[in-house]
Amino acid sequence: MRLLFAVTATAVALAVVAAGCGSTGRSGTTPSSSTAAATTTAAGALQAEANATVAGDIPDNQVFLTFRNSQAGYSMKYPEGWAQQGSGGVVTFRDKNNAVRAIVSSGAAWTKAAVQADAQALKGARVQGQPQAFTLSGRPAFKVVYQTVSAPNPVTGKRVTLTVDRYYLWKQGRRAVLDLGCPLGVDNVDAYRLISESFRWN
């Protein structure tokens, strides 16, 4: 299974679905997702290429490695064995119908208005609720959750619906959008919380 990502030319840099991929049940650090919603201001909605079966549960014993992006100036964890695509400002990791994408660029700090505008501009995505402000690993952030549907599989006609948690992050003239997507109904909360909380600016 292969995940495809559409990114607009101005890529820069998340409310609520009944069990968003990267939502956390904890209060105080990462907000919990309880309805579907959202994405970023220069990156299009995360897209999946439909496969015959929907798979995506990340095993409890999954090993995570640290990805260091010296060009974009950040590091984050990702599941060992996932395929990496891209470099610099746009990097994705994918496996089956799961996908994690980081988009980094220069720009002012994200505001609620800017996040709302970004989410409203997303094509091919269904966003619900308002951006949620919270603290991620000690730094301010916003989160939006959205759903996006793949094109039909050319053989089976099957479509895959992804639930995507989108995080908006920033620091000193740089900003990032972090998308974590998985098939609707798949519970990757713990793994995606680990990934989102591991993001560090250099």
PLM-predicted stretches and their roles:
Residues 2-98, 171-174, 179-202:
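N-terminal targeting sequences that direct proteins away from the cytosol to non-cytosolic compartments
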Residues 42-55, 84-194:
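Conserved polar/disulfide-associated segments of primarily extracytoplasmic proteins
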